[in-house]
């Protein structure tokens, strides 16, 4: 099981509880370490964990599209299409249609990525496509605070 999430939004609450529950059920679960260097790239170990997982839970939250999670997401969707990785989206305080149609904070995030000269335009297009794909998958909508 691979967990993809934006640490600032969910690491210390929803994701931590989910990770603990999965471990208690003896489900081998991989999540990134908050001590990992934050940046525009993800480690080869993280990519390997995605490729070797049978399931991925994607916790889409307000700041998800501002984070390096988009790189994870593109790899997850690629694996979903190629190797039968099962994807389970959780829409955490975001509307699934905003994810699908990239409205709200998703619009803001992509505007920021498109302005960043260090970010490849093809990568941004891949991230948008991956978000659209995941936004069309039936998932769990968490909207109560």
Model-derived features with residue positions:
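Conserved N-terminal substructure of TIR/SEFIR domains
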Residues: 1-55
């Amino acid at each position: 099981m691979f967990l993809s999430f934006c640490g600032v939004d969910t690491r210390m609450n929803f994701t931590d509880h989910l990770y603990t529950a999965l471990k208690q059920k003896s489900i081998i679960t991989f999540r990134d370490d908050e001590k990992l260097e934050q940046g525009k790239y993800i480690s080869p170990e993280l990519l390997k964990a995605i490729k070797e997982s049978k399931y991925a839970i994607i916790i889409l939250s307000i700041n998800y599209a501002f984070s390096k999670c988009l790189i994870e997401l593109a790899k997850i969707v690629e694996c979903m299409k190629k190797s039968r990785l099962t994807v389970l989206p959780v829409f955490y305080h975001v509307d699934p249609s905003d994810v699908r149609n990239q409205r709200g904070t998703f619009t803001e995030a992509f505007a920021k990525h498109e302005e960043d000269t260090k970010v490849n335009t093809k990568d941004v297009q891949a991230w948008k496509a991956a978000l659209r794909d995941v936004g069309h998958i039936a998932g769990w909508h968490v909207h109560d605070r």
